[in-house]
Amino acid sequence: MPSGEERRDRQKGRRAGCDTSSTPSNTAPRIPEPGAHPTAARPATAQPPRSLLPPVCSKTIALPASAAAASGSDTAGMRGLGKAPHSGEGHERGRGNSKMKACNNYQYGYLAKPDTSFWIKCRRWLLADAGRHTQRPFWTFRVSHSPLLEAEAGRPSDVSQLQLGSDLKPKMRRPAGELFSPKDAGWELDPAEKSE
C-alpha cells in the first residue's frame, strides 16, 4: 500500500497536470497492444483538449462544406438555393471568429427579399410599349390611303401600290375639285337606278 507521503506527492502531481499513475486518462501514454507496430503508440505529449486550442480564424482557414453545413448555414440541406460561390467581395471585415455572416453583396444574394415592385414596373413598361405598337388608331391607314380623299386633296394615288384601306382603284385620274363618279371606277349602276 502506498504510504501517506506517496499519496500526497501523487495528489500534487495530479493538480500540476502530470499524472503518472496507471489510471487511464486522455494525456497518459497508451501501452502498445501485442502485435501492433511499436511506433503506433500515442506519444507522451498528447494534444490538449479542444477548449485549450487557440481560436480558429475564419479568414485564414476555410471550413469544409460539411462543417459549414453543420454550423448553421442557411443553405444546409438545400441544394440550388442560397448564395452562389463567389470571391467574398462585399463581406464585412473584422469581428474575429464569428459565425457565418450575411452576405452584403446583393449581386449574389439570392435569398434576399426580391424587389417585386421592380418587376411590376417592368411589366407595366412592357405592356405599355407593346400597346404603343399594336393599338394603332384604326383610321390611320384608311385616311392616308383612301383614293377619294387623295383625289380631293390633289394627290392622285398610285394604283400600282397596294391600297391598305380600301379596295377602290380608280382607272382614270381626275384633277382635284372634280366629282368622282362610280362610272369612272368601272362600277355598273343597278338596273333600278338605270330605269330612273
Swiss-Prot record:
Biased composition (Low complexity): 34-50
Biased composition range(s): Basic and acidic residues: 86-95
Ranges for region Disordered: 1-55, 70-99, 153-196
Compositional bias segments (type: Polar residues): 19-28
Protein name, entry field: Putative uncharacterized protein MGC39545
Organism (species): Homo sapiens
